[in-house]
């Protein structure tokens, strides 16, 4: 008698298991790596991505590209996630981390197909990653924080390495200095929010400037604004969340009036309430008034008569940065404008930049904050410049917190590859093969750098292996001369943290994908959305 089949999952559920499914997941990850492979390094290409709404983005940043790709494959999404985590944690190395994870999987694919147990692979990978991280820590060069000149030089070199693969690599010296200046202005916490980046179209890239303080675009202003002064020395600043304009009553207000005098009294009361607020602000001694809500024409003219400057509808993040820079606090009422809640700065002025007017607060006593004003042509170009600067800022922050650096340009990967290959020869069994595969996978970084620059990768990798075997541990790819060079002396430096993070994240992702032995897809997730129903009225649906 046949046993009754047990139906556990809903009809239409797609489940795949075993080795074919694991191989399929590995292949999906390699497809993701193919998407960003050519963007690696100073000779990397850029991608032009157009989203569903027709917005075009040109980018060289691995994390940005993967975010914009609408990836649906569950295993491939893991690689997108590690690129995002690398971007959030370190800022740079997003393409490297994706390539490494895909290459680790590619190297173990033959072993998986032959039926090697995934746990053996995972154990070997964890061992290899631990050895590699310890080796990086051992050979990384520490820069003394006490020596400010030396530290600054190190930070600029790290920023230049991060910028050399971006669109703005021609101006990397200019921007590296700007980024280091910006990060140096911050306090010990090094908060990223304290660096504002504002984009102004027009002008050349070299016209970009760093403002030691807060700067934001002039807000919409009413009549009477022209009469306000545009520059103050040591002004007090009131930060408000109060509406200073006459408006029709909200919430269906109803008033019954019997005489003209009653109506006049109501109108007078409205004016008096507004003038009372304005008088209190004037009495507080504040010279610059910023509000998140609108400041109307009556208030604008009132302030202009008293030599005060006002700006309404200031974006919340700009208001908060001003508060953190100039002190004071954002008030929701004007009844308690005591000196403690007012901020102050050394100079406030409004100046013209390109076609826009900007408000500048400089000499802020409280926090260390700054604003980078970017100039440039096309909008996409400026957005990519902003992303590039974000990467460089993150790198400099990391380098300040962890003051050790390694050589980039594939040098550290080649050294780790040699070290792990030597180590694998000292151990017997399957682990030897797997750690050897891990070591071979590390060579993808210098190989891809050569491929992207159009060099003969095999030839250069042979030279690198020979040089590393002789003890030249900082030798990497020399992009400018199609050769190998001591990248530490060529100042291609990266914070050791970037490499440690990339290796651990890539290894974890590879282990995660190898450890999946079954994929179950619920039918509901693959059903097409229902077609829109026929419209009513004139535009009736037609059926052919």
Swiss-Prot record:
Post-translational modification N-acetylmethionine, affected residues: 1
Gene name, Swiss-Prot/TrEMBL: Cct7
Binding positions (ATP): 41, 93, 96, 398, 409, 499
Provenance organism: Mus musculus (Mouse)
GO cellular component: cell body; chaperonin-containing T-complex; microtubule; mitochondrion; zona pellucida receptor complex
Protein name as catalogued: T-complex protein 1 subunit eta
Chaperone listed as a keyword: yes
Reaction(s) catalysed (UniProt annotation): ATP + H2O = ADP + phosphate + H(+)
Linked residues for Glycyl lysine isopeptide (Lys-Gly) (interchain with G-Cter in SUMO2): 430
Modified residues (N6-acetyllysine): 67, 250, 320
Residues bound to ADP: 41, 93-96, 164-165, 409, 494, 499
Subunit text: Component of the chaperonin-containing T-complex (TRiC), a hexadecamer composed of two identical back-to-back stacked rings enclosing a protein folding chamber. Each ring is made up of eight different subunits: TCP1/CCT1, CCT2, CCT3, CCT4, CCT5, CCT6A/CCT6, CCT7, CCT8. Interacts with PACRG. Interacts with DLEC1.
UniProt EC number: 3.6.1.-
Modification Omega-N-methylarginine occurs at: 536
Residue pairs linked by disulfide bridges in the UniProt entry: none
PTMs per UniProt: The N-terminus is blocked.
The protein's enzyme class: hydrolase
Region (Disordered): 523-544
GO molecular function, one term: ATP-dependent protein folding chaperone
